[in-house]
Amino acid sequence: MEQHVKTRADAPAGFFAAEAAGLRWLAEAGGVRVARVIDMSEGRIAIERVDEVRPAVEAAEAFGAALAATHSAGAAAFGAAPPGWTGDIFIGRRSQPAIPRATWGAFYAAQRVEPFVPIAVTAGNLSASGAEVVGRACALVAEGAFDDDEPPARLHGDLWAGNVLWSSEGVVLIDPAAHGGHRETDLAMLALFGCPFLEQILSTYDQARPLRAGWRDRVPLHQLHPLAVHAAGHGPSYGRALVDAAEQTLALV
């Protein structure tokens, strides 16, 4: 099997081990195909190499249904890391907590949005007034305003188009920040930066596991996480987008 090797000399402890645990956990779901882990050590990981082809509508439709199956495999709790892994997980190069919580809102606000806000402010990418708006949105989320009866889903956690590879055998996922969360968060991240045949993906997902009414209105709520991550290190345009998403979240109630 041909392999793709990633190395990072300054990788924090557990950086690649967390990725490997996430890949294996997602693969166990039997939904979307995930790149297989071949080898892993403290400063490197080797995964199967995926020969990419042009995205196709048939593959997109299959991806939507398979993603629903992956989410349905579930997790022990909101915020739960893959079994066998303890400690922080990583999104890109940034660490984020993975502490199990009973409710989605308490987890999402405290572990997926709030940790990145002061970093964004210090970087000059988010104003103090903008941080106040985000803080109010997080308070609303933490109080349970958007909690529902959805069980914890098995999330990829960094589901943007760059981590969705199109092969001759269908979509293959790489580079997860896997954890237990709300399934709408994966879908919102997929929409944030665009993905080929997104509407077809969403359609077959919804057919396989119908989404709750109003899910499109909640996209900004579920984009708070990736926008906060990007505001922390990718410029003030993401800070402005984060504030806009926070304002839309506040307007939901």
Annotate each PLM feature.
Residues 2-106:
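ATP-binding pocket architecture of kinase catalytic cores
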Residues 5, 155, 220:
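Conserved Rossmann-like nucleotide-binding pocket used by diverse enzymes
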Residues 11-17, 42-45, 79, 128, ...:
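Regulatory N- and C-terminal appendages and interdomain linkers associated
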Residues 27-30, 71-78, 120, 145, ...:
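A general structural signal marking secondary-structure boundaries and capping sites
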Residues 42, 167-170, 224:
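Short strand-connecting beta-turns/loops that link adjacent beta-strands
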Residues 75-154:
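An alpha-helical support segment within catalytic cores of ATP-dependent transferases
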Residues 97-109, 118, 148-154, 161-217, ...:
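Active-site Asp-x-Gly
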Residues 220-228:
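Hydrophobic alpha-helical segments that form the core
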